[in-house]
């Protein structure tokens, strides 16, 4: 594995000396002649989370090199900075929260047209609470063989919230961004337990705290453990390694993984601006090819490469956390309370289960949650949800990259969805509340929730109307 000394990482195609290698490169060059790269030097952004792994692997294993790309990978301070830099063109593309480009399309926050042709990971998040909150939750949780029965539901928090309210204290929890997966998942868990996470009412009120019983606010992922340890928040939802970091530091307990909350949900995507994608179609496809190979490598042969992947991620220019902390979730296990380590082989999924394919239904689910909590503060037709998903998710580009890899002998047709794939997953009730999601009927889905907007309801003047 190549050692890098700087936060900005750069690599170029290696010139091979042997005649055989020269012949191979000449052949590759003739094949690529019809698809000349519009841009060879790229700068890609990420946030320090383990699910940025496909970017690190594509760099370290030379997959970007194979596509003729010179790539810099650069850590960003937070999701807003990252998103705005993609919009401005300072970054060619980036690791993004799955709902982030959808927020751009609907105009919640920065208005922008971002597209995604690659899902970077399924699952990979958890909800962690402070030791004090855990101490109060634990007596209400069923036990088996001396350990808590999972999944743990949010209704165990209700007596604690009542106590905080009686004492005049807010119950503060953190997520990473308003139009982010962690916000949607934390809200889902709380509401499934009968706890209101609050409404948005844009453009007047974008706090998301209207009517909230638990107060949610933004904290950048690497700052989550320290912010909780300081007492500013009592819990958070974030990706790894920042839940396992709380376990290792002895400051908190992850109470539920998102795999238990909603199985195999799209967590991160790779996003570029639509203008960039339109201007650089061949370069875009080349990037997706490299990322597909990286995701295949990460999930190959029952995760046999994960230890090497963890070594990459532990380097300071990537995630920079201790090897043991990252390995705790990347290698098919997950530690809840200290010493309570359990098998969770699909905590991080990069390729299996068609994990890297950009399903419209994943986008539609996130849009339903934006509507549920008022980020979309008006009723929309079922057709609108699919139309909006198609503005962002581009399975056509993904499959073009996949077919190129198949033609090159780097993948098999059976590795990918068939040509008949619609981009809509079958209805599923793999959620903590058992409510089935059918992406073809988003409004009917929303009407199933006890907490949240439905039908023609809107939030006005701090109240739900309609």
What are these regions (language model features)?
Residues 22-32:
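C-terminal segment of classical bacterial N-terminal signal peptides
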Residues 364-466:
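Conserved C-terminal helix/tail region of periplasmic/extracytoplasmic solute-binding proteins
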Residues 182-185, 220, 224, 242, ...:
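Internal, well-ordered alpha-helical segments in soluble enzyme and binding-protein domains
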Residues 49, 76-80, 95, 177-181, ...:
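Soluble non-cytosolic domains of exported or imported proteins
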Residues 34-217, 227-230, 234-264:
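Short, glycine-/small- and polar/acidic-enriched structural segments
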Residues 127-128, 269-272, 276-277:
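Short glycine- and hydrophobic/aromatic-rich loop-to-beta-strand nucleating segment
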Residues 2-17:
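Bacterial N-terminal signal peptides that target proteins for export
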Residues 279-397:
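Secondary-structure end/capping motifs
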């Amino acid at each position: 594995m190549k050692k890098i000394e700087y936060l900005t990482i750069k690599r170029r195609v290696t010139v091979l000396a042997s005649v055989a290698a020269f012949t191979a490169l000449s052949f590759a060059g003739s094949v690529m002649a019809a698809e000349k790269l519009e841009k060879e030097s790229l700068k890609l952004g990420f946030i320090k989370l383990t699910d940025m792994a496909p970017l690190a692997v594509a760099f370290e294993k030379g997959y970007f090199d194979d596509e003729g790309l010179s790539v810099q990978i650069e850590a960003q301070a937070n999701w807003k900075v990252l998103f705005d830099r993609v919009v401005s063109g300072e970054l060619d593309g980036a690791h993004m929260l799955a709902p982030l480009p959808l927020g751009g399309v609907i105009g919640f926050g920065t208005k922008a047209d971002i597209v995604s042709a690659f899902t970077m990971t399924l699952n990979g998040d958890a909800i962690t609470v402070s030791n004090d909150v855990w101490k109060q939750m634990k007596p209400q949780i069923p036990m088996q063989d001396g350990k808590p029965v999972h999944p743990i539901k949010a209704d165990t928090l209700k007596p604690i919230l009542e106590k905080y309210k009686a004492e005049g204290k807010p119950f503060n929890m953190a997520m990473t961004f308003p139009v982010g997966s962690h916000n949607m998942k934390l809200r889902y868990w709380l509401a499934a337990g009968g706890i209101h996470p609050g409404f948005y009412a844009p453009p007047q009120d974008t706090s998301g705290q209207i009517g909230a019983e638990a107060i949610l606010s933004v904290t950048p992922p690497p700052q989550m453990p320290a912010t909780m340890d300081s007492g500013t928040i009592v819990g958070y939802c974030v990706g790894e390694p920042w839940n396992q970091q709380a376990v290792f530091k002895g400051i908190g307990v992850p109470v539920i993984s998102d795999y238990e909350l909603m199985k195999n949900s799209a967590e991160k995507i790779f996003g570029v601006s639509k203008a960039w994608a339109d201007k650089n179609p061949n370069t875009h496809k080349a990037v997706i090819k490299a990322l597909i190979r990286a995701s295949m490598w990460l999930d190959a042969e029952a995760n046999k490469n994960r230890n090497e992947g963890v070594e990459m991620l532990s380097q300071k220019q990537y995630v920079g956390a201790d090897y043991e902390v990252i390995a705790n979730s990347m290698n098919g296990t997950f530690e809840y309370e200290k010493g309570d380590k359990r098998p969770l082989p699909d905590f991080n999924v990069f390729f299996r289960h068609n994990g890297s394919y950009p399903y419209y239904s994943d986008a539609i689910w996130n849009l339903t949650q934006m509507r549920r909590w008022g980020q979309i503060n008006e009723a929309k037709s079922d057709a609108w949800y699919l139309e909006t998903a198609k503005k962002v998710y581009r399975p056509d580009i993904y499959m073009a990259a996949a077919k190129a890899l198949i033609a090159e002998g780097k993948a098999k047709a059976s590795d990918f969805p068939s040509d008949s794939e619609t981009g809509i997953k079958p209805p599923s009730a793999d959620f903590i509340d058992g409510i089935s999601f059918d992406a073809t009927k988003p409004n009917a889905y929303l009407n199933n929730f006890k907490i949240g907007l439905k039908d023609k309801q809107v939030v006005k003047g701090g109240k739900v109307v309609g």
